[in-house]
């Protein structure tokens, strides 16, 4: 509320929309853009984690759309991983041998993990084999199945949450790196 009253605040002078009002606003915007510019690319930028994946999934089949946090960051990271493997004399298939620690479970972290996972599966690992090569750490530490993940935006994490016997839920990033030995 203080920000809304700040004379230097350039944003819209009303509280953030939530719930059905938010969903209706996004729907109206998408419909309006598609009616006016049917071939336009709609870029979703800096959406809250609790909305980002849901909105992308809702509209990706009906509109040309892209979420920079989920897809853009992930594409750059995947390209970097492929580039690093090439510099080390490897090939794309070598992604199946990698272990990843992802620091952050927001839109970007989930997108990165998802893209890397898809690349591993495309190179021959089963989905479960690929999931087992990931360690996801958020502000509360390592995420395992001991932690309830039922809030908005948690869907992309579900496959990565494993029954870990090597590290307990909430293990620090340093402890996870030491144990996981990411490549």
Segments from the language model and where they lie:
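Glycine-rich phosphate/diphosphate-binding loop of Rossmann-like nucleotide-binding domains
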Residues: 62, 67-177
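Short, intrinsically disordered, charge-balanced linker/junction segments flanking boundaries
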Residues: 181-183
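Glycine/serine-rich phosphate-binding loop and adjoining beta1-alpha1 elements at the start
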Residues: 1-98
